[in-house]
């Protein structure tokens, strides 16, 4: 960390951005999170100077949490225009009753909006304006919360979240706020002051306003010391991640979204919790507390069947089927047919599925006039049908002429549906086919794809040969896949 008096503010800011810029391919767009405050104003101004305003895209998120939010949006648009940078903004609704606090909810909403805007401009790099004072606040806040190694590592200079396309970079992380203030003064910059930054009801503000100023006279180097703590924690976390990666290779199936319970319980509790944390992060799931991870390990050790495992986390549910452990969406509306499968999955006298149509209709049928679509997104089902071009001889290839012959419909299971999995074979119930393939009951709540009134495709089973018998047809061919959102992301 460079003391504010050692070099000119402009030099240290330009040097910091120059290092970040050297890591990027020439002429790639640089997205900059621009709130209009001091820090992001300095970042945008300096980036426009050294990278060229044409490469910079100022992205503003309107949270609607302040009565001044509209004025801030207008200020940011005007400033970006004056610098010659492109500008975009997004309005978000921050859930106040999400259970994670208004600060965390606003942060999550902001990052989602920023990544959406980055995708709009093809930007793979997002510059954030956090500095050394922010890092000190973060480390201290994590210490007071009793965070583990990952929390103490605080903010990384460069980071790409799991399943994300955008790399987050913090080129100012080793600079002090005082240096940014001097830069802003030297260039007569104008910025906005968010009145909420002085509200000490928020934990971070309380540290900034009341605690850190009291530390400075007695521990003048506390920012450097806390930054070193973050660096040590980050190094330790990398070692834990390396260990977890080794364990994941040993415990996971060929599909890394599925773990072997028997292999998992061979690990000790600490190693098991470390693996779960790493696995969840690799899948893009929100992190869990140490207590929550310990409960997951405990239940996985004790569970002997699917009914004994009761773990819900952030809208997802940890499931056990035979020896397979995996996460499934936990808040979707399950069809009655899938519920019946759970009740008597392996009973010798398993009856045909029967269901109340009104229950299955919780997820309404969707229709598509297919005209060469490659992806049909179904938000209510948390997934998409994908139609990939293939050769006619490939397995489960379907002629495009059939797909466009009538409207495609995606419907919930009603119970009792039958299909043929090979030409000339007998019609069999979906339930029996699912069981034969070892598909867990909760994974059977999938949309069935119809062409007109004929069942064409069932996820995890394949094409219904009663509808398409494999005969030659003119034109192109497609393979149909069902991809849950966690695979698309």
UniProtKB/Swiss-Prot annotation:
EC number(s) given by UniProt: 6.3.4.19
Comment field on protein domains: The N-terminal region contains the highly conserved SGGXDS motif, predicted to be a P-loop motif involved in ATP binding.
Biological process (GO), any one: tRNA modification
Family (UniProt): Belongs to the tRNA(Ile)-lysidine synthase family.
Positions bound to ATP: 35-40
Record bears the keyword Membrane: no
Gene3D superfamilies (alphabetical): 1.20.59.20, HUPs
EC class (word): ligase
Protein's recorded name: tRNA(Ile)-lysidine synthase
Lineage, highest ranks first: Bacteria, Pseudomonadati, Pseudomonadota, Betaproteobacteria, Burkholderiales
Major location category of this protein: cytoplasm
GO cellular component: cytoplasm
Subcellular localization, as worded in the UniProt entry: Cytoplasm
Reactions this protein catalyses: cytidine(34) in tRNA(Ile2) + L-lysine + ATP = lysidine(34) in tRNA(Ile2) + AMP + diphosphate + H(+)
Domain of life: Bacteria
The gene coding this protein: tilS
CDD domains per the UniProt record, alphabetical: TilS_N
Task of the protein: Ligates lysine onto the cytidine present at position 34 of the AUA codon-specific tRNA(Ile) that contains the anticodon CAU, in an ATP-dependent manner. Cytidine is converted to lysidine, thus changing the amino acid specificity of the tRNA from methionine to isoleucine.
Keywords of the record: ATP-binding, Cytoplasm, Ligase, Nucleotide-binding, tRNA processing
């Amino acid at each position: 960390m460079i003391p504010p008096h050692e070099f000119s503010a402009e030099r240290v800011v330009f040097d910091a951005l120059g290092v970040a810029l050297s890591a990027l391919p020439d002429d790639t767009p640089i997205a900059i999170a621009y709130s209009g405050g001091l820090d992001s104003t300095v970042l945008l101004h300096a980036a426009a100077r050294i990278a060229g305003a044409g490469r910079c895209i100022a992205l503003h998120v309107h949270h609607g949490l302040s009565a001044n939010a509209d004025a801030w949006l207008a200020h940011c648009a005007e400033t970006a225009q004056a610098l010659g940078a492109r500008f975009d903004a997004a309005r978000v609704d921050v859930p106040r009753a999400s259970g994670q606090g208004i600060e965390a909810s606003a942060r999550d909403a902001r990052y989602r909006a920023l990544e959406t805007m980055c995708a709009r401009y093809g930007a793979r790099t997002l510059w954030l304006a956090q500095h050394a004072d922010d890092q000190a606040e973060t480390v201290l806040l994590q210490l007071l919360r009793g965070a583990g190694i990952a929390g103490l590592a605080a903010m990384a200079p460069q980071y790409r979240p799991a399943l994300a396309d955008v790399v987050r970079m913090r080129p100012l992380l080793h600079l002090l706020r005082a240096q940014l203030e001097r830069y802003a003064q030297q260039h007569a910059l104008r910025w906005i002051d968010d009145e909420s930054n002085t509200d000490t009801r928020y934990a971070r503000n309380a540290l900034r306003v009341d605690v850190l100023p009291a530390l400075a006279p007695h521990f003048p180097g506390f920012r450097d010391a806390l930054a070193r703590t973050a660096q040590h924690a980050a190094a330790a976390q990398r070692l834990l991640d390396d260990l977890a990666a080794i364990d994941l290779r040993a415990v996971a199936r060929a599909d890394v979204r599925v773990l072997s319970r028997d292999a998992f319980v061979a690990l000790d509790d600490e190693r098991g919790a470390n693996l779960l944390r790493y696995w969840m992060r690799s899948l893009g799931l929100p992190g869990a507390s140490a207590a929550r991870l310990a409960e997951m390990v405990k239940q996985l050790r004790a569970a002997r069947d699917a009914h004994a495992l009761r773990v819900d986390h952030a809208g997802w549910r940890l499931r056990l089927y035979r020896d397979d452990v995996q996460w499934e969406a936990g808040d979707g509306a399950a069809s009655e047919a899938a519920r019946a499968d759970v009740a008597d999955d392996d009973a010798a006298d398993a009856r045909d599925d029967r269901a109340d149509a009104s229950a299955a209709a919780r997820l309404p049928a969707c229709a598509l006039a297919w005209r060469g679509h490659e992806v049909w997104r179904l938000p209510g089902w948390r997934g998409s049908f994908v139609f990939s071009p293939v050769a006619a001889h490939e397995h489960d290839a379907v002629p495009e002429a059939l797909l466009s012959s009538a409207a495609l419909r995606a419907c919930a299971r009603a119970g009792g549906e039958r299909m043929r999995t090979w030409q000339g074979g007998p019609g069999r119930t979906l339930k029996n086919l699912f069981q034969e393939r070892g598909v867990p009951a909760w994974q059977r709540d999938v949309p069935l794809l119809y062409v007109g009134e004929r069942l064409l495709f069932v996820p995890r089973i394949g094409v219904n040969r009663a509808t398409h018998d494999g005969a030659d047809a003119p034109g192109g061919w497609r393979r149909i896949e069902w991809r849950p959102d966690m695979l698309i992301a």
